[in-house]
């Protein structure tokens, strides 16, 4: 069997009436390359940080500037195209990873990391065009499908799907189902990140948090499977993305000197989709025990984490606008981040609150690879209660007449 461009040994273990499929790559036992992963992530951060200043000048020269609109939060013209700087950092870090002895074998057995560079370059270029000249929704959607198709063509695709209810178990996907599932998830995450990019530092911070969570999860898989190269792609992709987001964030946090634009938000979404797919897509969950099955479902929860805020925001917006007799696509200033500002949170605090909510879900999902799921759920429950209280503090401080208490 060929999986992610890697030779996979398939073994069938008969136990009575049960049959388990065990997938193993032909190169294991190298351990967890933590130092190399840290170096690659740091490289992405440093290069992105310094490239952003150059891209800002370039954006102003080419007229890629976001002028304030009625529904926008920013009040002064701000250059876009930050995704170009992030892509420079990503491509440079992946190139470095391909030259490091401890990580090179991941490129031999997998096409996941080169696929991200190629597809990421395509989605970033589409975003650059939109940042400068603007694209209609259909053209942009076609570009997203094309970029996601490049990932699939180069071997980044779900091959099995685990359904933990109704006794369904593991479903081996045929080629059509694999392609459709991968395209649907990837394009959904791309649009989720594009949609959530409404406050300074929000998309970059959410990309950083979710990428770090996927990296932690991937390191846990590497640890538990003796450094199996199957888990190199999600570890490298996620740490590179985390580094790029970290390097861009100082330029983008309130008040932003530059916006990442669609070139950046769509790049983040595509890389998160690729990292999640390579973390769980090729794994046969029947080969593991109950605890590992829960852990291997965590990439789904990581996808939920990055999509939770925009999905909830979108649903509420559709209901709100439909009840008001307006088009669901009509713009307004009632999005989640607008509401956080309206109840009394500052711009920075609103962003940090959304970081908190996404971080609870993302790291809660990732931690199942290290801790008991029941204990993880308890900690997450406490964290959610704390997050609710912190979110509602401005309302709790108000008196009965709605005035702020001293």
Curated annotation (Swiss-Prot):
GO terms for cellular component: plasma membrane. Its cofactor is Mg(2+); Mn(2+). It is a multi-pass membrane protein. Its EC number is 2.7.8.35. Pathway: Cell wall biogenesis; cell wall polysaccharide biosynthesis. It is found in: Cell membrane. InterPro entries: Glycosyl_transferase_4. The keyword Transmembrane helix applies. The keyword Manganese applies. The chain crosses the membrane at residues 40-60, 83-103, 109-129, 152-172, 176-196, 202-222, 229-249, 263-283, 299-319, 351-371, 376-396. GO terms for biological process: capsule polysaccharide biosynthetic process; cell wall macromolecule biosynthetic process; cell wall organization; lipopolysaccharide biosynthetic process. It is an enzyme of class 2 (transferase). It catalyses: trans,octa-cis-decaprenyl phosphate + UDP-N-acetyl-alpha-D-glucosamine = N-acetyl-alpha-D-glucosaminyl-1-diphospho-trans,octa-cis-decaprenol + UMP. Inhibited by tunicamycin. Mycobacteria use decaprenyl phosphate (C50-P) as a lipid carrier in all known cell wall biosynthetic pathways, rather than the usual undecaprenyl phosphate (C55-P) usually used in Gram-negative bacteria. Involved in the biosynthesis of the disaccharide D-N-acetylglucosamine-L-rhamnose which plays an important role in the mycobacterial cell wall as a linker connecting arabinogalactan and peptidoglycan via a phosphodiester linkage. Catalyzes the transfer of the N-acetylglucosamine-1-phosphate (GlcNAc-1P) moiety from UDP-GlcNAc onto the carrier lipid decaprenyl phosphate (C50-P), yielding GlcNAc-pyrophosphoryl-decaprenyl (GlcNAc-PP-C50). Belongs to the glycosyltransferase 4 family. WecA subfamily. PANTHER family: PHOSPHO-N-ACETYLMURAMOYL-PENTAPEPTIDE-TRANSFERASE (PTHR22926), UNDECAPRENYL-PHOSPHATE ALPHA-N-ACETYLGLUCOSAMINYL 1-PHOSPHATE TRANSFERASE (PTHR22926:SF3). This is Decaprenyl-phosphate N-acetylglucosaminephosphotransferase. It comes from Mycolicibacterium smegmatis (strain ATCC 700084 / mc(2)155).
